[in-house]
Amino acid sequence: MIASSAKIHPSSAIENGAVIGENVKIGPFCHIGPNVVLADDVEILSHVAVIGHTSVGKGTKIFPGAVIGGDSQSVHHSALNTKLVIGENCTIREGVTMNTGTVEHGGATIVGNNNLFLAYSHVAHDCRLGNNIILSNNVMLAGHVTVEDRAILGGGSAVHQFTRIGRQAFIGGLSAVSYDVIPYGMLNGNPGVLSGLNVVGMTRAGIDRPAIHRVRRCYKQIFEGDGSIRANAAAIRNEYLDCAPAIEILDFIAAESDRALSSPNRGAKG
């Protein structure tokens, strides 16, 4: 079904079954598969493939060379009807690739709203991305990665499968992210080492100075205490019940995960 207001270049192939919303623009030499849904106001520039069971949210813009909704690159991919769901108002730049999920792990790759994917970044199967995230050029997310709201990943960084990146974390360019990164954490290097808190991001998010000072104190107690990271976090929880950002970090640490936690020491040399 193609809305009457959609504008589609005659050189593009729209397969039967695709759903094309109002005011969608599709430029030259694009391929839209039979199980694709493009919501209203989506814009696809040129030489883009949107395939698989893929839905693209309202107002999202996709630049040349992107391949959206390709099969999982997992060796265990069952080739069944898994899906990719992309939210509203995302910008997907040149050469970006996003894969559908795998049946074995829920069958869906989920991307939220207002995200920016710069050139040649990659979102693998079964990833879960929140809102207002930036993946800079050549960022690589392996399968099953979770990236929470407002995280920023610097150019060329690579994230190990099943890793979690907390809300408003900042990953430096060319970093290797092998372990979970706490909310508001900053990670740099290869191997990646936690290097403090994203204070600039916290300030931009409207967190006031007294709260930032408390979160800094919480951070030191977690990573410089005598016990393990998780034991230290559990021991201080009651002290921060009235500080939402600190509790967010403590809850993140307490949650079950397939990966260990990044720290100022794990991965550091010397």
From Swiss-Prot:
Its EC number is 2.3.1.129. It is an enzyme of class 2 (transferase). The keyword Magnesium does not apply. Gene3D superfamilies: Hexapeptide repeat proteins (2.160.10.10), Udp N-acetylglucosamine O-acyltransferase, C-terminal domain (1.20.1180.10). Its main location: cytoplasm. Pathway: Glycolipid biosynthesis; lipid IV(A) biosynthesis; lipid IV(A) from (3R)-3-hydroxytetradecanoyl-[acyl-carrier-protein] and UDP-N-acetyl-alpha-D-glucosamine: step 1/6. Transmembrane segments: none annotated. Belongs to the transferase hexapeptide repeat family. LpxA subfamily. This is Acyl-[acyl-carrier-protein]--UDP-N-acetylglucosamine O-acyltransferase. It comes from Rhizobium meliloti (strain 1021) (Ensifer meliloti).
